[in-house]
């Protein structure tokens, strides 16, 4: 599936547009009724030997996604359905900010590399917190419907990466 989507669509787009399109596809697949179930069924590893206990959490596997992909806490459930046991959202700053001017992400094909100079573009801490509150409320409604590590509607653990708002002077970073 990745080869098809990547070769046919994403590779032909500028890097930042490919990132946005890929994330949109993941979110849509996770929002369609039955979508998360299908994603987990087709793509997520389910071998019990992969289960991990870390930081007091029972996780369905050892693989997580670091900050930078889901900057605004919009797709943790969909990313969990792909098989990530934990997702770090952000980097989130206290205030919304646009990030660096474009182009700010580009490919270096000869080096098989991607350069990211995004600059913490995000909708701000209040927006991310509201999305996470809504996610938690949805999880609470589904509590008790499935048991055990990595089970239930949205089994992915979520962390938040925080950063300094660009407009804030360095000596005020802690207060920010």
Where would I find each of the regions flagged by the language model?
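Conserved alpha/beta-domain cores
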Residues: 59, 67-69, 80, 91, ...
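An N-cap/entry alpha-helix motif that binds or orients negatively charged groups
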Residues: 1-52, 116-121, 125-126
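Conserved, mostly hydrophobic/aromatic
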Residues: 14, 65, 87, 128
């Amino acid at each position: 599936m990745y080869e098809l989507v990547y070769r046919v669509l994403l590779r032909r787009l500028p890097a930042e547009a490919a990132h946005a399109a890929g994330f949109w596809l993941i979110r849509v697949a996770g929002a369609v009724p039955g979508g998360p179930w299908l994603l987990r069924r087709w793509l997520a590893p389910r071998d019990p030997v992969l289960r991990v206990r870390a930081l007091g959490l029972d996780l369905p596997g050892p693989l997580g996604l670091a900050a930078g992909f889901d900057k605004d806490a919009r797709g943790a459930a969909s990313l969990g359905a792909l098989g990530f046991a934990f997702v770090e959202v952000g980097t989130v700053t206290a205030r919304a900010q646009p990030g660096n001017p474009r182009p700010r992400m580009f490919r270096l094909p000869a080096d098989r590399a991607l350069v990211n100079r995004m600059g913490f573009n995000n909708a701000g801490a209040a927006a991310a917190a509201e999305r996470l509150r809504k996610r938690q409320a949805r999880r609470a409604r589904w509590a008790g419907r499935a048991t055990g590590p990595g089970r239930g509607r949205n089994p992915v653990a979520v962390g938040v990466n925080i950063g300094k708002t660009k407009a804030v002077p360095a000596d005020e970073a802690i207060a920010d």
